[in-house]
């Protein structure tokens, strides 16, 4: 089980990424625009650097919804491999069954 502070930190990162998504996209568009002046592009780089570090979506870590475990995350279900196996063995995941060949 992950610490509550780690789970809260991830929630904060998601909220910040949502809040600054449009602003970051706008600045990145200016930076990648070859027709923009060098000064405008440089100012956009500086503004992008001044945004909160956690507002970048790449800082987010996928975590299990039940335990907060960061490793062994199965994205289709939003669970770690351990909790996914437990749920599958209880028959709580429709269409998922134990492999047998």
UniProtKB/Swiss-Prot annotation:
GO terms for molecular function: rRNA binding; structural constituent of ribosome. Coiled coil: none annotated. Residues 51-70 are annotated as: Disordered. Keywords: Ribonucleoprotein, Ribosomal protein, RNA-binding, rRNA-binding. One of its GO terms (biological process) is translation. GO terms for cellular component: cytoplasm; small ribosomal subunit. Belongs to the universal ribosomal protein uS14 family. Binds 16S rRNA, required for the assembly of 30S particles and may also be responsible for determining the conformation of the 16S rRNA at the A site. PANTHER family: 30S RIBOSOMAL PROTEIN S14, SMALL RIBOSOMAL SUBUNIT PROTEIN US14M. Part of the 30S ribosomal subunit. Contacts proteins S3 and S10. This is Small ribosomal subunit protein uS14. It comes from Salmonella arizonae (strain ATCC BAA-731 / CDC346-86 / RSK2980). The gene is rpsN.
């Amino acid at each position: 089980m992950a610490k509550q502070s780690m789970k809260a930190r991830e929630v904060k990162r998601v909220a910040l990424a949502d809040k600054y998504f449009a602003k970051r996209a706008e600045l990145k568009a200016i930076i990648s625009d070859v027709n923009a002046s060098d000064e405008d592009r440089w100012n956009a780089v500086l503004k992008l650097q001044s945004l909160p570090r956690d507002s970048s979506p790449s800082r987010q870590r996928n975590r299990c919804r039940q335990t907060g475990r960061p490793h062994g995350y199965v994205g289709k279900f939003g669970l770690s491999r351990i909790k996914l196996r437990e749920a599958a063995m209880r028959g709580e995941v429709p269409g998922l069954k134990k492999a047998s060949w």
